[in-house]
Amino acid sequence: MTFNVSNATEINTDKSTYLIYAKPGTGKTHTLNFLPGRTLYINVDKSERPLKGNENIDILEFNTHEAWKEWSELMKWLADNKEIINQYDTIAIDNISELFRSMLANLGRNGKNERVPEMSHYQRVDFFTIDSLRFLQSLKKRLVFLAWETNFENYTPAGQQITQAVPDIRKTIRDNVAGLCQVVARLVFNEKSGKRGFILAPSNNVFAKNQLDNREHCLQEDLFKVGDVDDNV
């Protein structure tokens, strides 16, 4: 076995992993129109309409009714078709909240509990989801995972109860998924300006992270324009 060693000056942010989340209909999918280069869009939740007319995005249809088998076959297809995958700069999955639910429903439908998922099904989907995300990162592409938003009740060290906006991912693997990403960004709409933007800095109220630069927020169209800023005002 051999190991590759490289200098930190060679780190390339073009192959980073993003997790963007927001309530349904907020504009998550539209964000993909601002990606540079070519994108392979994995259409899990059938939200492809905001991408209409974009010549740089190819859409891969995904059968959520057979999601458990389909996702496994898709991972094998990606592994076996490097010449196709090498045509793309980005792989986008829209979205992983629905992916988890559809895989769980698929297992429950084929199980022994009258379509209700068994406890073991949750564990299988948890481990399969994380393992497949690791595999996707091995493809050395920019990855963009989209997710819905939910609220999580938490407590500060002082004992104060707070409500935090978080990606709609099972609590058991949420931190693991976020840990595999360089950016976790919450999309919000500003009613006064009429513009959409991303929150990139974590707080008691927002689950977020940004390891690529010093930005704490950005306009929707600037998410993938990585670079430090002098002032975050």
Descriptions of predicted regions:
Residues 86, 138-139, 179:
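Structured loop/turn residues at beta-strand edges in well-structured enzyme cores
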Residues 2-93, 97-102:
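Conserved P-loop
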Residues 42-44, 146, 187:
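Generic beta-sheet signal
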Residues 135, 151-233:
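Conserved GTP-binding G-domain of TRAFAC-class P-loop NTPases and closely related GTPase folds
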Residues 93-175:
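P-loop NTPase motor core
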Residues 31-36, 136-139, 226:
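Alpha-helix C-terminal capping segments
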Residues 54, 105-106, 193:
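Single-residue recognition of alpha-helix boundary sites
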